[in-house]
């Protein structure tokens, strides 16, 4: 009988990262997915990254994950979002050629050390004494294992809706999984329904682009991965159009036919990625909504109209599309649809992503209530790392709110749960100025090296970058001019007769990297390696970063204050019954987690700390 250390069920964005991370740590790993085409499949929009999401991709890359490198092999339209705003909210994004992305992912995984891939369907999980033992395939064969990672996406009791039509499916033309859903229910997991949707696909050859606005990408694509020196994929343009009052009228007239508004769907959809029906109802005063026409590939005429996700009947979809400028004569290749699926309350998992009920069972991706490729991949890499570390009886790997967006996401999910699809935003992070896309490797790669999940190749690249940063910093502290000379160049500085280094100049609000290069031309050769930009940001926001680091230190001290598993909150007399019940239900593991629970007062936190000091003065936390 076959036996593996770790089995990953599902080959989507969470699954591939989980499998690869587990394999990198030396665990014998099996990835089970329905068919080869599912590896890295982009079920919805053909793009990676965006605001906050781009930072997640960079963090995955920092831990030697796949997503950043793979998009660099298939990215056809790179754009830094929010670049006119502060660096804390910059969002690297790349449009993908679906075929190139999947091809690159498949090539990497099929040659990955310690990783086998099985194309088949898992029907059930064998559990004994609250611990995983094996997976059971739909042909009744059994594969033994120590750990299982479930990355089922929208396949758990998946149901597609197009108008009044219902189609049991995990994705178009793919069967859902009922066996796994039933098993999770039997075990006692809290299961609910969520919904997501996708727009119709249209034929780019039938679009009148003269009625649309051009959306060019960045002149020079900035790679996602530290392993990529330059993006060699041809770059293309996207286009923008918009809905009209006629579009809105058609949608309003047919709302009763929408699966969303007829009461047919019980699952809650993503708040920040609403269907076009939702937009018309929720933002009724808006006369138009933008639609981004995104090509799905270099040699593919399919266009993804980002912004009109819908579950209206096919005939209504055809009507509303014809009212959009440039799409009057467009051919619809595939209708849009909504899909409803099961998910598990993420408070059922710990920060390692292992379930609390079943030892050795991990969840990652949409099963935890998230939406988005990047959110799924971020969970996948953490689940894969922790499953492999557990096999080797090593300490778990936990990211926190203080060092990563991945940590913020996992903390949000495991502390608060979610009743709607969770999407990452910069606003969710209290330390976003410190947790930027440009410094993800400096925050996380060394942590990855310490546990052995980072390859030698990446380790060498990272070590050299750190050395180059120190050399560049030294140079920027050496290059200087007098204040009088700077004034003659039109740079406003206090005339105190001192010398100002480049790092000093970077702190001037109106001063930028381009000016520094103009004054010191030798800096131009450093412009392309991103180090100059990194040091510019660090200098520009030095005072803010210093304050934020103090906040982070306070946060970390509270995270280090463990709360014993056997604590009885009802024995702490100075806190209310409501708070005692809330703490008993949430079971926070640290003072930091307890503080973040809604309704827990500062006075209650103080009472807990005092109680711990008196009751557990010996340092016991069992």
UniProtKB/Swiss-Prot annotation:
Which keywords describe this protein according to UniProt?
Cytoplasm, FAD, Flavoprotein, NAD, tRNA processing
Amino acids binding FAD: 10-15, 122, 177, 366
Q: Which Gene3D superfamilies match?
A: FAD/NAD(P)-binding domain, GidA associated domain, C-terminal subdomain
**Would the keyword Cytoplasm be found if you checked this record's keyword annotation?**
yes
Q: One biological-process term from Gene Ontology?
A: tRNA methylation
From which residue to which does any coiled coil extend?
Answer: none
Identification of the protein by name: tRNA uridine 5-carboxymethylaminomethyl modification enzyme MnmG
Read off the Pfam families from this record: GIDA, GIDA_C_1st, SAM_GIDA_C
Query: Which cofactors does it use?
Result: FAD
- Record note on quaternary structure: Homodimer. Heterotetramer of two MnmE and two MnmG subunits.
Localization recorded for this chain is:
Cytoplasm
Purpose: NAD-binding protein involved in the addition of a carboxymethylaminomethyl (cmnm) group at the wobble position (U34) of certain tRNAs, forming tRNA-cmnm(5)s(2)U34.
Q: Name one GO cellular component term.
A: cytosol
Q: Which HAMAP family match?
A: MnmG_GidA
Gene of this entry:
mnmG
Which cysteines are cross-linked by disulfides?
Answer: none
Q: Which InterPro entries match?
A: FAD/NAD-bd_sf, GIDA_C_N, MnmG, MnmG-rel, MnmG-rel_CS, MnmG_C, MnmG_C_subdom, MnmG_C_subdom_sf
Binding site residues for NAD(+): 269-283
Q: Name one GO molecular function term.
A: flavin adenine dinucleotide binding
Q: Tell me the protein family, please.
A: Belongs to the MnmG family.
Can the keyword Ion transport be found in this entry's annotation? Answer: no
Q: Which domain of life is it from?
A: Bacteria
């Amino acid at each position: 009988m076959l036996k593996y250390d770790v089995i990953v069920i599902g080959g989507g964005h969470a699954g591939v990262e989980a499998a690869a991370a587990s394999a990198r740590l030396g665990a014998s790993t099996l990835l089970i997915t329905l068919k080869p085409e599912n590896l890295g499949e982009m079920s919805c929009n053909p793009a990676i990254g965006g605001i906050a999401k781009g930072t997640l991709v960079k963090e995955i890359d920092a831990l030697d994950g796949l997503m950043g490198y793979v998009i660099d092999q298939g990215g056809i339209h790179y754009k830094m979002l929010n670049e006119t705003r502060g660096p804390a909210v910059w969002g690297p994004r790349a449009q993908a050629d679906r075929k190139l992305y999947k091809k690159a992912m498949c090539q990497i995984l099929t040659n990955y050390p310690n990783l086998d891939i099985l194309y088949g369907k898992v029907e059930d999980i064998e559990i004994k004494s609250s611990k995983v033992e094996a997976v059971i395939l739909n042909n009744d064969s059994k594969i033994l294992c120590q750990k299982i990672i479930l990355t089922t996406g929208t396949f758990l009791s998946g149901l597609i809706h197009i108008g009044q039509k219902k189609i049991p499916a995990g994705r178009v033309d793919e069967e859902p999984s009922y066996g796994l859903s039933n098993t999770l229910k039997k075990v006692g997991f809290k299961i609910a329904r969520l919904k997501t949707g996708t727009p119709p696909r249209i034929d780019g050859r039938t679009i009148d682009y003269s009625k649309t606005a051009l959306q060019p990408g960045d002149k020079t694509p900035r790679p996602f991965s530290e392993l990529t020196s330059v993006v060699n994929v041809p770059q293309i343009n996207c286009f923008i159009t918009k809905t009209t009052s006629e579009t809105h009228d058609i949608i309003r007239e047919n709302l009763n036919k929408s699966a969303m508004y007829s009461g047919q769907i019980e699952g809650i959809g993503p708040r920040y990625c609403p269907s076009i029906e939702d937009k018309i109802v929720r933002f009724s005063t808006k006369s138009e909504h933008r639609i981004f026409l995104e090509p799905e590939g270099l040699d593919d005429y399919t266009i993804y109209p980002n912004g009109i996700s819908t579950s209206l009947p096919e005939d209504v979809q055809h009507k509303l599309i014809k009212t959009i400028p440039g799409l009057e004569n467009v051919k619809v290749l595939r209708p849009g649809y909504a899909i409803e699926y099961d998910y598990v309350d993420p408070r059922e998992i710990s920060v390692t992503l292992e379930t609390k009920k079943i030892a050795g069972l991990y969840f990652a991706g949409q099963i935890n209530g998230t939406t988005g490729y990047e959110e799924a991949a971020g969970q996948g890499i953490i689940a894969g790392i922790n499953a492999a570390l557990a096999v080797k009886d090593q300490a778990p790997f936990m990211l926190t709110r203080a060092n990563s967006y991945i940590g913020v996401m996992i903390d949000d999910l495991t502390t608060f749960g979610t009743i709607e699809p969770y999407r990452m935003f910069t606003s969710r992070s209290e330390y976003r100025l410190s947790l930027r896309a440009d410094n993800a490797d400096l925050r996380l790669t060394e942590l990855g090296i310490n546990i052995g999940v980072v390859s030698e190749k990446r380790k060498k690249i990272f070590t050299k970058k750190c050395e180059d940063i120190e050399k560049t910093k030294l140079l920027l502290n050496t290059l200087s001019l007098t204040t009088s000379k700077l004034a003659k160049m039109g740079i406003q500085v206090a005339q105190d007769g001192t010398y100002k280094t480049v790092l000093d100049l970077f702190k001037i609000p109106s001063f930028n990297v381009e000016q520094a290069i103009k004054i010191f031309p030798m800096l131009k050769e450093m412009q392309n390696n991103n180090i100059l930009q990194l040091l510019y940001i660090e200098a520009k926001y030095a005072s803010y970063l210093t304050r934020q680091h103090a906040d982070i230190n306070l946060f970390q001290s509270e995270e280090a204050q463990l709360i014993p598993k056997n604590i009885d909150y009802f024995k702490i007399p100075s806190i209310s019954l409501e708070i005692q019940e809330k703490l008993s239900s949430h079971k926070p593991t640290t003072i930091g987690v307890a503080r973040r629970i809604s309704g827990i007062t500062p006075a209650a936190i103080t009472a807990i700390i005092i109680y711990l000091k008196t009751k557990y003065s010996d340092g016991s936390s069992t």
